[in-house]
Amino acid sequence: MKRRNADCSKLRRPLKRNRITEGIYGSTFLYLKFLVVWALVLLADFVLEFRFEYLWPFWLFIRSVYDSFRYQGLAFSVFFVCVAFTSNIICLLFIPIQWLFFAASTYVWVQYVWHTERGVCLPTVSLWILFVYIEAAIRFKDLKNFHVDLCRPFAAHCIGYPVVTLGFGFKSYVSYKMRLRKQKEVQKENEFYMQLLQQALPPEQQMLQKQEKEAEEAAKGLPDMDSSILIHHNGGIPANKKLSTTLPEIEYREKGKEKDKDAKKHNLGINNNNILQPVDSKIQEIEYMENHINSKRLNNDLVGSTENLLKEDSCTASSKNYKNASGVVNSSPRSHSATNGSIPSSSSKNEKKQKCTSKSPSTHKDLMENCIPNNQLSKPDALVRLEQDIKKLKADLQASRQVEQELRSQISSLSSTERGIRSEMGQLRQENELLQNKLHNAVQMKQKDKHNISQLEKKLKAEQEARSFVEKQLMEEKKRKKLEEATAARAVAFAAASRGECTETLRNRIRELEAEGKKLTMDMKVKEDQIRELELKVQELRKYKENEKDTEVLMSALSAMQDKTQHLENSLSAETRIKLDLFSALGDAKRQLEIAQGQILQKDQEIKELKQKIAEVMAVMPSITYSAATSPLSPVSPHYSSKFVETSPSGLDPNASVYQPLKK
């Protein structure tokens, strides 16, 4: 088998690209695409009256059922469908409609943004806040425009299906932890048995093994890889551990043996199929550091060519097979495949080491000639790129700190505004109480004013009636006066003609009548002034009444409430009266029952006494009846009669020859 040496100096390097502009344009285009898709789906929802975003979890469910049927069999797929259907039914029955639609839509859009390569950052969080705000403020209250009965099962599936997948994920996580624990226990047992086997060897071989181990550790400078490397699933690395690979490995040699294990735990992106034992300690140290820095920048063609060369010659290029954790990209969180490779054991490592050390020194020289110029060419670029990465990390850290400070300032401002709103709420409550008190006082004043208005209207009517009556009397008085004057003139003329003596009396009478007329005119003027004043008061009261129409509405509402309360009080009093009557009737019935029971007991006692007396009478009475010989006037009495019943003890004479009952 021919050996091929990779000419590292002739490898094609990729063109340099400005990563800052590329990242900005790529991220903005990605989030603009998200916004456009979201807007189009909302528009389709509004136009067609159906929520199309609910179909995406249904499509994911169909894919997962197909994958489970293809890889895990029919039984598991049927079980998965039954569990998902049960979860959907529970969500459909027990979650209210509005909360169900809100949770389903929010989960769909949040999960859609989560499926990006960016992870959790400020744009994704802002998109999440936008989606949640739109769902809560607009679509949460507006369910009339959609077919609720058609969309509700899909909404229940959007909640039930993630719950089922979360349950399966939790189960797999628990089983993974249990498997790791079992592996650790088995590893401890294997180490214990290995120590027993080493102790069982002769002491000379034990000393030789110890010396070999010390020489290997001193020559390598880097500790050997643990045989218990964690097997990584899904072929990816978590997003929060992509940047923690370069710095711990650069400082690899400065730390002790205990810290080396912690640094290896952070290097989670190493593929298990490519872990091999190094050929030489110096060559391994140089090429490990070089390839760790350069593998971050190599494109896919370079990686493919180096992997083909590594497969053909595993000894010369064993140290080039380390892959950087930052170069591995996680495909999607839904991937179910695993990259579980075989890790070589300690015996295979020793065999490879012996094979590689047995080669001629010319191979080492060739390898140094092929790789050292490449190291000298690539180290400055790697350092520059590392410095750029460090600057980017510092800038990101500073930006995150600024965002954190802004969020804290927003939280403090929101808390202060909340306190101000609470104080304003207290003031508004106090103002509301004051306004209620003023309204109550205004209602009371309005009642008083209405009472005064009614009294004044009554007085006005009385004054108008008195005025009309006085005017009638005045007209009658004028007519009578005219008639009297006419009659007086006639009488004067007649008297003057007949007698000249009556003129003085008539003149006195005329004077008196004129004085009375003047008095009546004065009284009329006074009454007219009073009537004018009353009319002015009535006008003022009418204006006041027109201004208080709003208070009349309040009074009507208050009167209606008072009528209701009066009706309720009347009904309550009627119910209490009925209850009292029922209780009194119940007491009377109980008393009558007790009296009847007492009478029944008395009758029972009387019956018992009568039975005793009957028994005594029947015991003493002869077999034949006798007539009353001594008293012929008395009628024949029967053998037994109720008239002979006595409450006192029996007064019979036992010495009598013939028994005769005594009549009382």
Swiss-Prot record:
Which stretches of sequence are listed as region Disordered?
253-274, 320-375, 630-664
Q: Where is the composition biased (Polar residues)?
A: 320-348
Where are the annotated coiled coils located? none
Please indicate which superkingdom the organism of origin belongs to. Answer: Eukaryota
Q: Which Pfam families match?
A: Macoilin (PF09726)
Q: Which residues cross the membrane?
A: 28-48, 75-95, 120-140, 154-174
Q: Where is the composition biased (Basic and acidic residues)?
A: 253-265
Q: Give the disulfide map.
A: none
**For this chain's UniProt record, which GO biological process terms are given?**
neuronal signal transduction
Which residues are recorded with the post-translational modification Phosphoserine? S305, S332, S631, S634
| InterPro entries, sorted | Macoilin (IPR019130)
User: Any idea which UniProt keywords this protein has?
Assistant: Endoplasmic reticulum, Glycoprotein, Membrane, Nucleus, Phosphoprotein, Transmembrane, Transmembrane helix
Q: Its topology with respect to the membrane?
A: Multi-pass membrane protein
* Localization (cell): Rough endoplasmic reticulum membrane; Nucleus membrane
Where is carbohydrate linked to this protein?
N324, N340, N452, N655
Q: Would you name any one GO CC term?
A: rough endoplasmic reticulum membrane
The main location is: endoplasmic reticulum
Physiological role:
Plays a role in the regulation of neuronal activity.
The Swiss-Prot or TrEMBL record describes its family as follows: Belongs to the macoilin family.
Q: Which PANTHER family match?
A: MACOILIN
**Protein name as annotated:** Macoilin
**What organism does the UniProt record list as the source?**
Macaca mulatta
Q: What is the lineage of its organism?
A: Eukaryota, Metazoa, Chordata, Craniata, Vertebrata
Q: Which gene holds the coding sequence for this protein?
A: MACO1
